[in-house]
Swiss-Prot record:
PANTHER family: NADH DEHYDROGENASE SUBUNIT 1 (PTHR11432), NADH-UBIQUINONE OXIDOREDUCTASE CHAIN 1 (PTHR11432:SF3)
Membrane topology per record: Multi-pass membrane protein
Molecular-function GO terms, alphabetical: NADH dehydrogenase (ubiquinone) activity
Residue intervals passing through the bilayer: 2-22, 70-90, 100-120, 147-167, 172-192, 222-242, 253-273, 294-314
UniProt organism field: Bos mutus grunniens
Known partners and oligomeric status: Core subunit of respiratory chain NADH dehydrogenase (Complex I) which is composed of 45 different subunits.
EC number: 7.1.1.2
Major subcellular location class: mitochondrion
Keyword hit for NAD: yes
Signal sequence region: none
Protein name, per record: NADH-ubiquinone oxidoreductase chain 1
Subcellular location: Mitochondrion inner membrane
InterPro entries attached to this UniProt entry: NADH_UbQ_OxRdtase_su1/FPO (IPR001694), NADH_UbQ_OxRdtase_su1_CS (IPR018086)
Amino acid sequence: MFMINILMLIIPILLAGAFLTLVERKVLGYMQLRKGPNVVGPYGLLQPIADAIKLFIKEPLRPATSSTSMFILAPILALGLALTMWIPLPMPHPLINMNLGVLFMLAMSSLAVYSILWSGWASNSKYALIGALRAVAQTISYEVTLAIILLSVLLMSGSFTLSTLIITQEQTWLILPAWPLAMMWFISTLAETNRAPFDLTEGESELVSGFNVEYAAGPFALFFMAEYANIIMMNMFTAILFLGTSHNPHMPELYTINFIIKSLLLTMLFLWIRASYPRFRYDQLMHLLWKNFLPLTLALCMWHVSLPILTSGIPPQT
């Protein structure tokens, strides 16, 4: 039974990731005053299926000088971790109701760095290695602010269980009292998922495609699916943290519909940002984090810690 539950979670995630590629190409197309994919199937709806078939029937070529085991393990690990991070998400019921769901998600996102590092190093290509080093530095750096923002939000919620956030936000969305945190969180999720304008790992003019430059066919498709699964997961996480949906136990489908609409709108915002903004320089990316976001998030975290004490209130009870 548990295996059926897992499959019921994994298959829709992979399908959503596949169709997100189509949505992205369509959105970018219309924003650049062109049509986007419109040949394969009605309105190009079968394009992701055609892409998947093409990628998986191609021969997965491997550079002769690459490290075999790591080269193959890296994309499997990337997709495995991307899917694992969905386990504690309340939709409205999580797959496994964890006591420390938020910590689990932080740990899994930290492990994702290894798949990037392995792929860059095992490819035995200077472009892949430079791309991987950039990606690792960027991911590790932005995880610092993500963790502090999460801590601040959890201080208002009072529990590391994600389901508690639904109860906390029955009165008001946390985006209202914590809007500076929400803005910094959203920008940090863009950087964490290596999306434009922070997609320095795949600066086409410099590094061709970044850490996955030597990958082709199936393994490349695994990286691709991992990236899009992470994008959807991050937006769902944002919706849970700051735009909490109230859950009526008698009609759980209302929660799901509401939650999906919010996540979709946030995902569309990701695509809109990609169509609008140019890429940052690498030093600007690091300055934004270490000189702007980190001091601000630390100050706001201290503020949220001291607020209940100052107002003689009690901290949130779980």
